[in-house]
């Protein structure tokens, strides 16, 4: 047995005297001495390893301290950014309300100044950040290239820093902070396998930092860090919950909250600047947009058996959605609360701006050339806010790589074995689920809301022209000037020409309002028609303003003589369909078209009051209709997911467009070859009537219930179950203005002079807006 001990000790380690002619003798004392030497050797090795492990533990503790400090600073910056965004939003809301009270020439100057304030170029941003870095470099008093370095001498105390110190932190955290979620997964994976060995090896009270700092270290003390990771996750969840609650409150309270304000008080709709085809990315982090209290109220205030937006027991009676609940939209924010004005470099813009422009400049909005996952954190513009801490925290590190500090940060990260990343986003696949991932945003890194769809189905974000929101005939915003308390859900509205009377259709009657005197709170007359329990679905005035045609959830159409001393029904048209969903009048006032619940389009001779023809083609209810200005072509949309055009001279179908969603509304541009379609899936699509090209617009969050073109043809409005009124530029859909009401907006109309908009909503009222140019 003792002889076998010689096999334990390689001769290369402890050579012994050896004579080839004599046998090898091994005594017990020599073996003990050899064992003692080996023990001392192992003890020395153990001591050396222990020192190295203690050194590593010390480094880990130091790095963990740095990590926590960066996290606290990032959180502080996030809070500061949120605060500044809120300040900017409120200031811009004040500006939007004050500007209309200025004289016309001053209005133009102020509006131009505000617009200039939004045009921040990359050169200006680089100069501003360079000044901040230089000031910070001088204040720290050391010569290192990055103001916040891993060396303790360059670290500020773990407190919330002022906004001025953000640049250095952003630069370095773009490399360190972006991967904050990776160590947690890595440590959990190794935790079970290494726990037993780690427990018997080095016992240290230090807390483990990021697991990827030393890739060659196989046996790490992960037990302590695992608990720290759980604690870290818990803190992040608490922060997220706090931010989500704030965001939802802001959505309800800081937009245009009709329920919390005097209905008669004029208010400007949020005057954002959607020149750039981008929108807030924070909303996109949520998979299912929660139903706000306002939408719940709107649903509860709308009779489920009658309203256009809810399902009925019989699908043939009322056009309905395939689903009673609004489709969750994550690719479109709540307009009015999350659409952010874009910053686009303007060629030739001088670096200096006037004091008003500089005071209105939106902070922390850095355009980034990367596509969506590497975009900037969405700043809150005139009516935007940060609603998701996840997006805000991740986006906090995504500063433009053109800044020199980012390169230094990458070098600092490389010293710790990390790849120099720019704003790694662990949830980038969740950002824009409804928009193909191969689509990049416009310059600025924000996902677009307007897309051009080519003939082969390729979607590309639309670059808006410089005159998208300026020029004759393009409104700046709309101001609510009157509320007409109808008393029932208002499913139909129309405005007289000239603009004096508004007709609102509810349950069993049409009420007539004189809006030339805003003080009038009562209708001037009430036209009882259909049955008392049946909803009016459409009412149309003949061009002379003397005749009103009313249709709804009944088989008859009522023709009213408004020129009589007392308005009276002069005729009724009876069809075989149980309901009429929409009406259109020919330009010569001789023919009326009605969309029937059985899918047919009935053509009525108004002079002889007879049915002269039926267009058959829709396999489900025909829900919406419009007619070309020359009276030769008719467009209809249906619940069979199709839009069809009809030749009125030949009485035949011309075209058919198939969609994947039910069609709830449409409008034909009075001056051009464009047809806008509002759908159940919350999209608005603008089709060219002779070419396969089209535009797809994403700002609504639920069904698009009504749509109307301005008579100039340069813009149109759409309303939806998401309580929103959106105004769009024809045809590419730049968002001109948005207004949020307190309930679903079921119907709308625009006056002939394009100066007034009227909407009918689920909270039993109609709202009159003045369009401000």
UniProtKB/Swiss-Prot annotation:
The keyword Cell inner membrane does not apply. It is found in: Nucleus. In all tissues examined, mostly in brain, and muscle. Its main location: nucleus. Residues 1-136 are annotated as: Q domain. Residues 275-452 are annotated as: SP domain. Residues 137-204 are annotated as: GP domain. Coiled coil: none annotated. Signal peptide: none annotated. It holds the Pfam family WD40. WD repeats lie at residues 485-523, 531-570, 575-614, 617-656, 658-697, 699-738, 740-773. GO terms for biological process: cellular response to leukemia inhibitory factor; negative regulation of canonical Wnt signaling pathway; negative regulation of transcription by RNA polymerase II; Wnt signaling pathway. The modification Phosphoserine is found at residues 208, 212, 222, 245, 250, 269, 273, 292, 321, 323, 419. Residues 317-328 have a biased composition (Polar residues). This is Transducin-like enhancer protein 4. Transcriptional corepressor that binds to a number of transcription factors. Inhibits the transcriptional activation mediated by PAX5, and by CTNNB1 and TCF family members in Wnt signaling. The effects of full-length TLE family members may be modulated by association with dominant-negative AES. Essential for the transcriptional repressor activity of SIX3 during retina and lens development and for SIX3 transcriptional auto-repression. Involved in transcriptional repression of GNRHR and enhances MSX1-mediated transcriptional repression of CGA/alpha-GSU. It comes from Homo sapiens (Human). Residues 1-22, 140-162, 182-360 are annotated as: Disordered. Belongs to the WD repeat Groucho/TLE family. WD repeat Groucho/TLE family members are characterized by 5 regions, a glutamine-rich Q domain, a glycine/proline-rich GP domain, a central CcN domain, containing a nuclear localization signal, and a serine/proline-rich SP domain. The most highly conserved are the N-terminal Q domain and the C-terminal WD-repeat domain.
């Amino acid at each position: 047995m003792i002889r076998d001990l010689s096999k334990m000790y390689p001769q290369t380690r402890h050579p012994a005297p050896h004579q080839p002619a004599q046998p090898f003798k091994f005594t017990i004392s020599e073996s003990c001495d050899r064992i003692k030497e080996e023990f001392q050797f192992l003890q020395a090795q153990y001591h050396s390893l222990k020192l190295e492990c203690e050194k590593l533990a010390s480094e880990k503790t130091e790095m963990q301290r740095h990590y926590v400090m960066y996290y606290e600073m990032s959180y502080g910056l996030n809070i500061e950014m949120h605060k500044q965004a809120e300040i900017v939003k409120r200031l811009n809301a004040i500006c939007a309300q004050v500007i209309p009270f200025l004289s016309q020439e001053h209005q133009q100057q102020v509006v131009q100044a505000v617009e200039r304030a939004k045009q921040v170029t990359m050169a200006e941003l680089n100069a501003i950040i360079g000044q901040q870095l230089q000031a910070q470099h001088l204040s720290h008093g050391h010569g290192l290239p990055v103001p916040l370095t891993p060396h303790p001498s360059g670290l500020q105390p773990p407190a919330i820093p002022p906004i001025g110190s953000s640049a250095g932190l952003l630069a370095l955290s773009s490399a360190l902070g972006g991967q904050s979620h990776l160590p947690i997964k890595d440590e959990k994976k190794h935790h079970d396998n290494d726990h037993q060995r780690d427990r018997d090896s080095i016992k240290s009270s230090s807390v483990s930092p990021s697991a990827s700092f030393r890739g060659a270290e196989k046996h790490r003390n992960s037990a302590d860090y695992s608990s720290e990771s759980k604690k870290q996750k818990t803190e992040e969840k608490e922060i997220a919950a706090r931010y989500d609650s704030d965001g939802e409150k802001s959505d309800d309270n800081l937009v245009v909250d009709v329920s919390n304000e005097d209905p008669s008080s004029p208010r400007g709709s949020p005057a954002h600047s959607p020149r750039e085809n981008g929108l807030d990315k924070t909303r996109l982090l949520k998979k299912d947009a929660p139903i706000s209290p306002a939408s719940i109220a709107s649903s509860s205030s709308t009779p489920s058996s009658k309203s256009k937006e809810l399902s009925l027991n019989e699908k043939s009676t009322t056009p309905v959605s395939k689903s009673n609940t609004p489709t969750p939209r994550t690719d479109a924010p709540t307009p009015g609360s999350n659409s952010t004005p874009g910053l686009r470099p303007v060629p030739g813009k001088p670096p200096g701006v006037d004091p008003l422009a500089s005071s209105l400049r939106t902070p922390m909005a850095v355009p980034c050339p990367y596509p969506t996952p590497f975009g900037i954190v969405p700043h809150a513009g005139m009516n935007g806010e940060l609603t998701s801490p996840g997006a805000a925290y991740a986006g906090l590190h995504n500063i433009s790589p053109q800044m020199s500090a980012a390169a230094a940060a990458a070098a600092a990260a490389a010293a710790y074995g990390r790849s120099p990343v720019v704003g790694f986003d662990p949830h980038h696949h969740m950002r824009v689920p409804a928009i193909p991932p191969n689509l990049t945003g416009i310059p600025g890194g924000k996902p677009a809301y307007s897309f051009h769809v080519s003939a082969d189905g390729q979607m590309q974000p639309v670059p808006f022209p410089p005159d998208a929101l300026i020029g004759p005939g393009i409104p700046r915003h709309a101001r609510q000037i009157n509320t007409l308390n109808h008393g029932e859900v208002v499913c139909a509205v129309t405005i007289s020409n000239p603009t004096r009377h508004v007709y609102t259709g509810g349950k069993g009657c049409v009420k007539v309002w004189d809006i030339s005197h805003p003080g009038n709170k009562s209708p001037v007359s009430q036209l009882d028609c259909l049955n008392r329990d049946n909803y009016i679905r459409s009412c149309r005035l003949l061009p002379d303003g003397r005749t009103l045609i009313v249709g709804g959830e009944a088989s008859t159409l009522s023709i009213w003589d408004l020129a009589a001393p007392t308005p009276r029904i002069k005729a009724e048209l009876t069809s075989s369909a149980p309901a009429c969903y929409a009406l259109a009048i020919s330009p010569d006032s001789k023919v009326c078209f009605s969309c029937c619940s059985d899918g047919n389009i009935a053509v009525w001779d108004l002079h002889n009051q007879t049915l002269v023809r039926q267009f058959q083609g829709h396999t489900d209810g025909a829900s919406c209709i419009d007619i070309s200005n020359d009276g030769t072509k008719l467009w209809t949309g249906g619940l069979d997911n199709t839009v069809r055009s009809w030749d009125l001279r030949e009485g035949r179908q011309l075209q058919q467009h198939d969609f994947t969603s039910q069609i709830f509304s449409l409008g034909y541009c009075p001056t051009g070859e464009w047809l806008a379609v509002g759908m159940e899936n919350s999209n608005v699509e603008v089709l060219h009537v002779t070419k396969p090209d089209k535009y797809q617009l994403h700002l609504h969050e639920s069904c698009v219930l009504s749509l109307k073109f301005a008579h100039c043809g340069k813009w149109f409005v759409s309303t939806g179950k998401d309580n929103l009124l959106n105004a769009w530029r024809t045809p590419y859909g730049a968002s001109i203005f948005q207004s949020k009401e307190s309930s679903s907006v079921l119907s709308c109309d625009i006056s002939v002079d394009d100066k007034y908009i009227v909407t009918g909503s689920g909270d039993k009222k109609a709202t009159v807006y003045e369009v401000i140019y």
